[in-house]
Structures are given as structure tokens and as C-alpha cells.
Swiss-Prot record:
It is found in: Cytoplasm. GO terms for molecular function: adenine binding; adenine phosphoribosyltransferase activity; AMP binding. Its EC number is 2.4.2.7. HAMAP family: Aden_phosphoribosyltr. This is Adenine phosphoribosyltransferase. It comes from Levilactobacillus brevis (strain ATCC 367 / BCRC 12310 / CIP 105137 / JCM 1170 / LMG 11437 / NCIMB 947 / NCTC 947) (Lactobacillus brevis).
Length: 172
């Protein structure tokens, strides 16, 4: 029987600002069986894609990506904010509601031709994941799939990821 993962998501109105419904994954992470089952769902999605590396953006992409990489017996590379990686990096900028941000990946994190799964907790507007994909591709990696615990459908992030395979465990 399939797990109803939505019962492990806390919906917090007006956070971080009025009019926003925040979807908190903390209860899912706090329940070992549910978190393991959610990880297994993403692993099942990725199994037939010959994934060789998982990449996730700071910070909740680490929470999703690391256990997936562990279960698959492959590596994980973190896409971080400025100043967080100690060696030579590549950079991808993306738009925020007011301004811009950027993510960085070590230049040697991805080998040319390496098949990569990009993971995050949430697909909203697609900006963060779009930048993460750009980093992977700038290094010659091939994004064979993207996986999320939650997709906020009203924000149309899927539209920014046209041409990429998208898996989301829950949709709101």
C-alpha cells in the first residue's frame, strides 16, 4: 500500500511572510520509516536512469540528495551559496522575487558525460533547480532526472524545466 506522505508535511500559513503557505518537511524527516519510504520512492524513480552522481542545492537539497546517493551507492555533490566551497568553482545565477542569487559547484564535482540526478525538497518557481542544472551541464554532466519531495504546482516551476524528466512525490 502506498504511503500518504502529505500527512507528514506541516502546512504553516503566512510563513515566511503573509500570503505564503509554507510546506515544512520536518515532520517527514522526524519519522524514520516515512523518510526512508520517501527516499525509496526517489531511488525507485532513479534506478533505471543509470545515475552516477546526485547533486542537490543548499540546504534542503542535501537532506533529500544524500540519502538517495547513499541508497544507490553513488556520490553526492553539494551546490552551495557563495563562499561555502573551498576549491575552484563554477557559478550559476538565478532570479529571486527581488534580485538575484547564485549557486556554486566545485569544478571537479562532475565528470564530463556523467549522468546526474538533481534533487531538492521543493519545486516552486524552478529558479534554484534551473541554476543547479546549469552548473551540472556547464561541467559536462548529463541531467537524467530531477526529483523533489514536494511540487507547488501553482508556481509553474515545471515550465522552467521543460525537456527534463521531473519526479515529485507530493503535489500541492
Amino acid at each position: 500500500m502506498a504511503t500518504d506522505f502529505t500527512k507528514y508535511i506541516a502546512s504553516v500559513p503566512d510563513y515566511p511572510e503573509k500570503g505564503i503557505m509554507f510546506r515544512d518537511i520536518s515532520p517527514l524527516m522526524a519519522d524514520g520509516q516515512a523518510f526512508h519510504a520517501a527516499t525509496d520512492e526517489i531511488v525507485a524513480y532513479a534506478k533505471d536512469k543509470d545515475v552516477e552522481m546526485v547533486v542537490g542545492p543548499e540546504a534542503r537539497g542535501f537532506i533529500v540528495g544524500c540519502p538517495v546517493a547513499y541508497e544507490m551507492g553513488i556520490g553526492f555533490a553539494p551546490a552551495r551559496k557563495e563562499g561555502k566551497l573551498p576549491r575552484e568553482t563554477v557559478k550559476a545565477s538565478y532570479d529571486l522575487e527581488y534580485g538575484q542569487s547564485a549557486l556554486y559547484l566545485h569544478k571537479d564535482a562532475i565528470k564530463p558525460g556523467q549522468k546526474v540526478l538533481v534533487t531538492d525538497d521543493l519545486l516552486a518557481t524552478g529558479g534554484t533547480i534551473g541554476a543547479t542544472i546549469q552548473l551540472v551541464e556547464d561541467l559536462g554532466g548529463i541531467v537524467v532526472g530531477t526529483a523533489f519531495l514536494i511540487e507547488l504546482q501553482d508556481l509553474h516551476g515545471r515550465d522552467k524545466l521543460k525537456g527534463y524528466d521531473i519526479f515529485s512525490l507530493m503535489q500541492y
